[in-house]
């Protein structure tokens, strides 16, 4: 059990990365070194590509060919982020690297909640999962979602297409979007 050296009080340390490595070791019959290699290299690589794909898909906002092309080409653009990965990897910050590579997945899930409220449980679990791997990624998700709301959803709220107009209707739609995202984030963080 981790504890503070000076006060002897217990410390919180997220165990998501280590639990993933232990599960790999048990279920895939890997040695500890092999499990660490998979957890520290493959997990961030795959989740970074998925994060880029999900964020591109959300930014394009379409399900057709344009969305598919954006989601397919976004991981190629992530290759430029490779130096950041090596800094994290060679300093031994493997949980941090894994959590930061999952940020786009959690942010994209939270961004879809105002359009599809039935995604609240999945988005909350995704947000909680990123925090379980390493809590340093939670503010990054919050900043991405807040900027998305301020720069896009504030001007184009979710229920705008329904035809009803008016100041109070617009305020209600924006408040509803913030409430749905906030409830999801709180449920994931609790």
List where the protein language model places each region.
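Hydrophobic alpha-helical transmembrane segments
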Residues: 69-73, 120-125, 138, 142, ...
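Perimembrane helix-loop-helix junctions
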Residues: 140-185
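Specific aromatic-rich, kink-prone transmembrane helix
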Residues: 97-115
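Helix-loop-helix junctions and helix-breaking kinks within/between transmembrane helices
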Residues: 91-95, 131-147
